[in-house]
Amino acid sequence: MLSAEQNDKLARVGPGTPMGELLRRYWHPIGGESEFETKATRPVRLMGEDLVLYKDLSGNYGLMDRHCPHRRADMACGMVEADGLRCSYHGWMFDAQGACTEQPFEDTANPKGRYKDKVRIKAYPVRALGGLLWAYMGPLPAPELPDWEPFSWKNGFRQIVISVLPCNWLQGQENSMDPIHFEWMHANWSKRLRGETGPYGPKHLKIDFREYDYGFTYNRIREDTDETNPLWTIGRACLWPNAMFTGDHFEYRVPIDDETMMSVGWFFTRVPRDAEPYVQESIPVWHGPIKDAQGEWITSHVMNQDFVAWIGQGTISDRTQENLGLSDKGIGMMRRQFLRDMEKISRGEDPKAIIRDPAINKAIPLPTIHRDAVMEGMTAEEIEAGGALHLKRFIFQYGQPEHVLKMQQDAMRISQDNKGYVDA
């Protein structure tokens, strides 16, 4: 149980808040590169700030205040140029660093005045990696953008899924340190949703949480596993400060503001060895719905089930009403680490998992369950005969578009569908 003050300290992310200042020390995924194949600008809201993400005519990305500092026009309606974004209202232009480089009438009427030198727009660095676009909103110099090894994995079909959820980001991230929910939400509840009354999934017998350089792992033993199983020896990674890596996909929980978050999923499906070599030219990005046509929460897919649990806690979970147990040890570890990191940045120190040395920021390995299967692959026959459901259907989020399913089928060269976990 937390006090109301502690809860606010951990949840709220606006400029100047303790958690907001901490999260601004890290890079966050805010969109996908392929989204800009057909458009040049997109409005985004991040940690309570209204911004516009754009790709200029030179192919460079930028992120700046959504409102022009001249008369507050919407820069999302701006015109991209070779080296920046131009306001469509009066033509003022800004580069990726926020400098005003042109004021057409001012430059003509008073060329020596150089009024443009006195005007700037708020701007943040943007980088592309793994098909994602990443933003850094903290003090400079920016740390390294973590180059996780999975971003360079070969012979896999990748897709990026974005969903906007009406709840605070921390509810999503605390899920990254909660192994017991797999037993009940994804196994037992899924059976009930299928109309089954049993048997239930295997019980958890033992759990552990281990800190490492880039976050924590949760490790578990179920009735059907032992201490030699990768679920215990390797575990799954809670990546600091707001992500999870399961062994074949990333889940990022990006704060839009205090009451809204963006789930950004990056998924890798290893193609059969029969389909190698496979080179994916563009990583599709699609937006996953969270409600059906009747306005009911979607519960058929794994992450949609998670979303229901997070949203159900309220816009900002009232942690003063909690009663934590043994299964929640990881939640406590996470909260204490956030508070320690807030203290560190108040002293001018880097928080946990910041990378400054480019020499070590090269294909950084992560805890990966069933690593051999991911790296070496399986034959199409082995996949068809085996129980690896995630290689035969996209079970993680509802709403995979038909054209993305077709791309996945073409890559895998075996039958694919996008039915959910509940339909299994």
Swiss-Prot record:
Residues 27-135 form the Rieske domain. Keywords: 2Fe-2S, Iron, Iron-sulfur, Metal-binding, Monooxygenase, NAD, Oxidoreductase. Its cofactor is [2Fe-2S] cluster; Fe cation. Disruption phenotype: Mutant can degrade syringate and vanillate, but not DDVA. It lacks DDVA O demethylation activity. It cannot grow on minimal medium containing DDVA. Optimum pH is 6.0. InterPro entries: Cholesterol_7-desaturase, LigXa_C, Rieske_2Fe-2S, Rieske_2Fe-2S_sf, Ring-hydroxy_dOase_2Fe2S_BS. It comes from the Bacteria. [2Fe-2S] cluster binds at residues 68, 70, 87, 90. Coiled coil: none annotated. GO terms for molecular function: 2 iron, 2 sulfur cluster binding; iron ion binding; monooxygenase activity. Optimum temperature is 25-30 degrees Celsius. The keyword Oxidoreductase applies. Fe cation binds at residues 181, 186, 306. It catalyses: 5,5'-dehydrodivanillate + NADH + O2 + H(+) = 2,2',3-trihydroxy-3'-methoxy-5,5'-dicarboxybiphenyl + formaldehyde + NAD(+) + H2O. Binds 1 [2Fe-2S] cluster per subunit. SUPFAM superfamilies: Bet v1-like (SSF55961), ISP domain (SSF50022). Its EC number is 1.14.13.-. CDD domains: RHO_alpha_C_DMO-like. Involved in the catabolism of 5,5'-dehydrodivanillate (DDVA), an intermediate in the biodegradation of lignin. Part of a three-component monooxygenase that catalyzes the O-demethylation of DDVA, leading to the formation of 2,2',3-trihydroxy-3'-methoxy-5,5'-dicarboxybiphenyl (OH-DDVA). Belongs to the bacterial ring-hydroxylating dioxygenase alpha subunit family. Homotrimer. The three-component monooxygenase is composed of an oxygenase (LigXa), a ferredoxin (LigXc) and a ferredoxin reductase (LigXd). This is 5,5'-dehydrodivanillate O-demethylase oxygenase subunit. The gene is ligXa.
